[in-house]
Structures are given as C-alpha cells and as structure tokens.
C-alpha cells in the first residue's frame, strides 16, 4: 500500500509530517510512503528511509494563495504532486495538512470525482463524551446543498463508519433545529423524507446540543450548517478548558485540587483530542484524500495515516461506489 503525503503542508511541516510518517512505517509493515516537498528540509528530520521515498519539489501552496488558482497554476506544488501520484496510480491515497480549499480543488481537478456523486463532502470525526466519536459531513466543502447531496453524504458516511470505524449498523442523524418529524427548513424536510427510504440506519433528526453525547454515529448537514456547528463545538471546548484552568490556578487550595485531579483531567483531554481521530476525509472522490488538521503534530499525522490506510484496506471507495450503483437516486 502506498500513500503520498504533502510534506510541506501544515503549521509544523515538514517536521511533524516526517516524524508521523516514520512512526507509521514502524507500525505498519505493508505501508510505503512518498513524502512530497523540499528534500533538504525533509532530510533534516528523516532518520530512516525504510519504505519512505522523497519526491522533491521547491514549490508549495501558501495559505494566502487563492485555492483554485493555486492548484491550476502551481502544477509542481507539493500538494498537487501528491494528488497527481494518486491520479497516476503510483499511490493509493494522499494526505495534506495544508490549505483546505486547495486540497478540495486538488481532489476535484486532479484525483477526480467519483462517478454518480454530485458534490464531495468534508468529513471529520468529532469527539464525544464516551470517547467513541461521530462522523460529521459536510463541514464546509459546499456551503449550499441540494437534497440529493445530503442523501449521498448519508450513504458515504454510513459506509465509512462501518468499514473504517468498525461500527455495525451505524446510526445516521440529520442535523436540525428539533428532533420531531417535520422540523426545519424545506431542505431538511426533503432530506428527511429521502433518508427514511435510504439503505442506512436513519435515526431521524438530531440537535447540535446532543452531538457530543453520541446521539448518532454519522451526522449529516449542508456545509454551511456543518462548519458553524464544528467551529461552535471547537470554540466551546477551548473556552471550557480555559475557564477550568483559570479556576484551578486561582488559589493555593485549588492548585492542590488540580494536582489530585490531573490524571482524570488528562483522560478527559485525551477523549476530546482531535489528533487521535485522524483527519477529515474528502468523500466523493475516486480515491481517499485526507485533510489533516493545520496544526497537526506528529501524532495527528500518524492518526491520519492510520485512518487513510484503513480506508484503502477496507475498500471504502469501491464500497461507496457499489452502494450508490445499487441505490441510484437522481
């Protein structure tokens, strides 16, 4: 199995990418990795070249670049070359912690959209209080959506949750303003009716306040709604941890309490740590394309590689294609 990785994407590249890749190579004997980027910088952190190949390029996509224009003009950019490796059949999948918009453009223009899928979806795995997490799609690939798009998101998310996350008969929920049937705008109502007849375990509408309680294994929404919900959850979690830290450091007695509680707090932090869940998959493309978090450390990169390897090994893309062929809905 071969995975191409944009070694220059992310806040801590190439160090975090190289260290994460070496960790994955040690863990998985069937894995070969191509690191795409500036060879001189990559070699500063590469202590072993076992099953690791470097594809040198001096060009990369900057966070300030306009995504679509950058992908079209910077043909030798590390992210574009990683996607090209997939298109050419040299690699089975690709990963980048670089610009989300640019990776979506590279996925569409270079890797290509899966036949029958109208719009790809960006899908991270979000943490829950029980540590199991849930798949959420779309969180920003498309801010506007039609009912058919959300129907396809639900099917793709269900296949992923079962194949990669090992959830038997995953529960699929539609993010809405209430749990009752008939709630929401016209889009929500149409999608609800379609999902009731879909080849999935549809559990109905779910509210954003219940997401972290693990009310569903897959949560479906349009990209605008998903992005707002995602950032609200992230912001709330950061604010709560910040307030908790402030209170625990406010006095001598509270500092003593913090010392006692530290092991439990670390368990809680690990449960809510996105780095353990991998990256956000771009569903709807011809091959696995994974967007790692921009601030990914080596553990985050390792988790993204593990996730990508599972997608390839469990044949997620062929399975989605097969399901969509059996259940055509235009």
Swiss-Prot record:
One of its GO terms (biological process) is fatty acid biosynthetic process. Its EC number is 2.3.1.274. It comes from the Bacteria. It is found in: Cytoplasm. It catalyses: a fatty acyl-[ACP] + phosphate = an acyl phosphate + holo-[ACP]. GO terms for molecular function: phosphate:acyl-[acyl carrier protein] acyltransferase activity. It is an enzyme of class 2 (transferase). Keywords: Cytoplasm, Lipid biosynthesis, Lipid metabolism, Phospholipid biosynthesis, Phospholipid metabolism, Transferase. Belongs to the PlsX family. Homodimer. Probably interacts with PlsY. This is Phosphate acyltransferase. The lineage of its organism: Bacteria, Bacillati, Bacillota, Bacilli, Bacillales.
